[in-house]
Amino acid sequence: MQITLPGVVLTNSPAEKQHVIVKIFSPAGLLSAFAKNGASLSCDFRESLFPISFSLFTIQQSPPKMRKVIQGELQNPFTTIKSSYPLLQSAGKMIQAILKTQWHEKPSPHLFSLFFNFLQRIPETQYPNFFSSMFLLKLLQHEGSLDLSRSCTLCKTSLESSTIYRYEGALFCEKHAHEETISFSQEEDHILRVIVQAKKFQELVCLAEFPIDIDTKIDALFSSFLSETSEPSSLYYKGKTLL
């Protein structure tokens, strides 16, 4: 059976001879596929297999064999990202976040749309690392792992006017904070909430025009979430909710 789907190549790994195995993120989720002679100059869709490339793929499915890329029509090579180290580094951060949180074959149309739009908009930003950290926050929200209440998870003390401590998906007051929690001032937590609640990309792009020193804390918060999860990129979705 053949299917046609849009997708962004996240990784491209060499196989024997000049074959490659690509990991593609699409509305259908994270997929791995084999491309015969994909690294060869004679492959007419070789460029569609490069990492950070958006293409329309024709894929052959013959279980239990690995999917096979039959054709790829390059739609957007994201040349601007690939020609700038800061942009490339920031895009790579988003890619790693997807690889570390998403299960194979779990449909994620909303997350794919979010990721694709972040890739399109990141060249417009003055602070791409901050912009990619915004994606990590949106991803935490998508996974249902970002507490937006205003009270301590343990004692329910109001955090309206005090330093807020976050770890994984929980909020803590100063009394229940531990050495691994990440502290956010009221102003920093307000910015975090503005990012999460933003409904338009232009709002995020505008926010990323300011040198707001919060990206390191967001990245640390995301890492705390990963510390309690398995390695989803090595597992397969079996048609049931796993997260």
Curated annotation (Swiss-Prot):
GO terms for cellular component: bacterial nucleoid. The keyword ATP-binding does not apply. Pfam families: RecO_C (PF02565). GO terms for biological process: DNA recombination; double-strand break repair. The keyword Disulfide bond does not apply. It comes from the Bacteria. Keywords: DNA damage, DNA recombination, DNA repair. Coiled coil: none annotated. Signal peptide: none annotated. SUPFAM superfamilies: ArfGap/RecO-like zinc finger (SSF57863), Nucleic acid-binding proteins (SSF50249). InterPro entries: ARFGAP/RecO (IPR037278), NA-bd_OB-fold (IPR012340), RecO (IPR003717). Involved in DNA repair and RecF pathway recombination. Belongs to the RecO family. HAMAP family: RecO. This is DNA repair protein RecO. It comes from Chlamydia trachomatis serovar L2 (strain ATCC VR-902B / DSM 19102 / 434/Bu). The lineage of its organism: Bacteria, Pseudomonadati, Chlamydiota, Chlamydiia, Chlamydiales. The gene is recO.
